[in-house]
Amino acid sequence: MTDTPVEESLFQIIHCFHQYAARQGDMETLSLQELQALLMDNMPRFMDSLGQKEPYYVTELFQATDKNRDNQICFDEFLYILGKLVKDYHLQYHRQLCARYCAQHSLY
């Protein structure tokens, strides 16, 4: 049986995490630099659309997520980041839908 698109996406997320984690030190954690590279390389339009392409956004996200303050993001912490990004993307999605709807149904 083949993987569903969602299953394939999950495997790709896991692979991506390990691919970037392997760049420096521990293969099971991301440094700030690895996280920045992962997000900028894999979500450039998304980060740009949120107006959060500046490094401080990723730095603040990293610091807020690194609960044990070891300057590394483990996979569980990375999942928290993904959840936040998905929420932000969902909000952006609705803003775009609303803008299109309002443009099509303008009273002016």
Curated annotation (Swiss-Prot):
Binding positions for Ca(2+) per the UniProt entry: D66, N68, D70, Q72, E77
Record-linked PANTHER family: PROTEIN S100-A15A, S100 CALCIUM-BINDING PROTEIN
Pfam families given in the database record: S_100
Nucleotide-binding as UniProt keyword: no
Gene that this sequence comes from: S100A15A
GO terms under cellular component: cytoplasm
Keywords associated with the record: Calcium, Metal-binding, Zinc
Alphabetized Gene3D superfamilies for the sequence: EF-hand (1.10.238.10)
Domain spans labelled EF-hand: 53-88
GO molecular function term, any single one: transition metal ion binding
Organism: Gorilla gorilla gorilla
A Gene Ontology BP annotation from the UniProt entry: endothelial cell migration
PROSITE patterns attached to this UniProt entry: EF_HAND_1, EF_HAND_2
Protein name, UniProt field: Protein S100-A15A
